């Protein structure tokens, strides 16, 4: 509980601790060109969609670097964008 509160407070000041979950605006996430050039396989997307429909959660976490560039979780990003979600749970990595 103490860690979650500390992470939220740091997030208010733009300080993001790796390993803590934060909610960010979809529009603030930058997608590197490599992700845009290579679309996920259809089977992979179908699996990710099935999981999302069953649980309401992403199967893969969305990982960002400190510049808000996507590091991993592109399939979850695609689902969020398709569903017109505005805020997403993300984790920051070094």
PLM segments and residue spans:
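Short, charged/polar connector segments at secondary-structure boundaries
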Residues: 1-94
